[in-house]
Amino acid sequence: MRLQKAPLVTSGLVLGLLGLGNLLKDLSLTLNAVCGIFAFLIWIHLLCTMIKYFNNVKEQLNSPLVSSVFTTFFMSGFLGTTYLNTFFSNITFINSLITPIWILCLVGIMTHMIIFSIKYLKDFSLENVYPSWTVLFIGIAIAGLTAPVSGYFFIGQLTVIYGFVATCIVLPIVFKRLKAFPLQTSIKPNTSTICAPFSLVAATYVIAFPKANAFIVIIFLLLAQIFYFYIIIQLPKLLKEPFSPVFSAFTFPLVISATALKNSLPVLMFPDIWKGLLFIEVLLATVIVLRVFIGYLRFFLKKENQDKFLRNASQ
């Protein structure tokens, strides 16, 4: 059966799957590989769609919502290098591609951020602001999370510092927008991206800075968990809505929040009770990613629903 076109926001699911695989890596290398394979297959489908329907891609990118979410396409590339390093580092040719791919993703995400900023900040409108602006402007911090793969720890450290400052600037603007112009019901899942930036900074800090300061780790983790539970409280209501590709917004934020907790605990030496919280967060992230993944498979097989979303996305 022929699969329907993949909307650009599909990259959010790819990122979520890759992040989940790395989150589960210590538990099972097989699960890590399975997540990577599914992510790669969906990424290939997305890439083929982008090439074949390039004009439609340009139309979708005219939407500030879709364009801000598309940052996850480049973020997926960063995480993809960790899979190449894990499973193919012994193959000389593939190993030689890891750092160039990492650099290409860095250039890509910076270029996308600059183009978006020129387009939407020059004539700023609060109505063009979406929660996924946090991903757009802070997503580059994932360079620090993957710094061990490229070896560019200094760049990773700069992105962590930038990510924290940018989060402090962007989040208040996002909340102001949500108060002045509440999101339409159909795109409310995008709200879940609010918990991503501080979690990404927290998860990245202990990786990019080998000698992480415990006090800073506590501050970052506390902020990350506060926004995480802010979203978790809303999650049951958000999940009641009919499935839409915007559900991809649920995946990476929950995964990176669990990753932030996982990365921070060894540094903080907290009591074992915190491992119970980690288990719950990992389990929840796994369930949500699986649900969204299944939803996408069904979506790709239903042309009517797919065409409706693409029309809305290009508006």
Across the structure, where does each feature detected by a protein language model lie?
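Membrane-water interface of transmembrane alpha-helices
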Residues: 41-52, 108-116, 167-174, 229-233
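Membrane helical hairpin/interfacial module
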Residues: 25-90, 99
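Generic multipass alpha-helical transmembrane bundles of integral membrane proteins
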Residues: 104, 133-228, 233-234
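Helix-coil boundary and interhelical linker segments in multi-pass alpha-helical membrane proteins
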Residues: 22-31, 84-97, 145-157, 205-216, ...
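Membrane-embedded alpha-helices and immediately adjacent juxtamembrane helical segments
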Residues: 21, 29, 38-44, 175, ...
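Juxtamembrane helix-loop boundaries in multi-pass membrane proteins
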Residues: 1-21, 55-82, 102, 118-145, ...
